[in-house]
Amino acid sequence: MNNAINSPVIVALDNMTKNASLALADQLDPALCRLKVGKELYTRCGPEIVKALHQRQFEVFLDLKFHDIPNTTAQAVLAAAELGIWMVNVHASAGLEAMALAKQRLLDSDFDTLLIAVTVLTSMDNEALMQTGITDGLDAQVSRLAQLTKQAGLDGVVCSAQEAKTLKALCGQDFKLITPGIRLLDDNADDQKRICTPKQALNDGSDYLVIGRSITQAADPAAKLQLILQSL
């Protein structure tokens, strides 16, 4: 589809029903943004929600964060690609073998679906990491998993804007950085610990910006999207 190729904005359809998601999609221009379908919406609606968004000419980021043994992870990624999605993700902590196999399955089947990895969830901080047994800090863990992702041949990682400069230097300019936790200055932080404004994120090296409530809960989502794009 490639309609939104010049826009860095991915609108997150989080905490929404199928009807609400499609109503929002009908207010947005597929030339100005892509859409993210996460676990809740996909679990409620299945592949039909992706098909409905494709019918509206949107490119879709399927945000299911697959994390399983290598073959299961790879087959799940392949199944996602068969839906015609633009991008899908896995957890980097699934390991090098799982990530590399998933990428190879895409290549073997001639899919150009972008495959990215999640390093550390943006809701987590150093204390949360320590509770899981990772004691050398957030920055070290993010860098380690980003390098593992690059080694596996994936296209990029999900990361906070604060990590973008470091990861671009570490993994190269072609390594895509997808940044959630994007808020406007007058928004609440909600459940994200590491947040940033759209312009700051792009300046710091992010390639794509995942924006949810700022747009989805706006009185006029289309106008808010235009405002964000004009600010970049």
Swiss-Prot record:
Residues annotated as catalytic: 65 (proton donor)
Source species, domain of life: Bacteria
Classification via SMART domains: OMPdecase
GO terms for biological process, alphabetical: 'de novo' pyrimidine nucleobase biosynthetic process; 'de novo' UMP biosynthetic process
Pfam families: OMPdecase (PF00215)
Record EC number: 4.1.1.23
Family assignment from sequence similarity: Belongs to the OMP decarboxylase family. Type 1 subfamily.
Protein name: Orotidine 5'-phosphate decarboxylase
The protein's role, per its UniProt record: Catalyzes the decarboxylation of orotidine 5'-monophosphate (OMP) to uridine 5'-monophosphate (UMP).
Residues that bind substrate: 14, 36, 63-72, 122, 183, 192, 212-213
A cellular component annotation (GO) from this entry: cytosol
Pathway: Pyrimidine metabolism; UMP biosynthesis via de novo pathway; UMP from orotate: step 2/2
Catalytic activity: orotidine 5'-phosphate + H(+) = UMP + CO2
EC primary class: lyase
Keywords: Decarboxylase, Lyase, Pyrimidine biosynthesis
Keyword Membrane annotated: no
Assembly with partners or alone: Homodimer.
GO molecular function: orotidine-5'-phosphate decarboxylase activity
Organism: Psychrobacter arcticus (strain DSM 17307 / VKM B-2377 / 273-4)
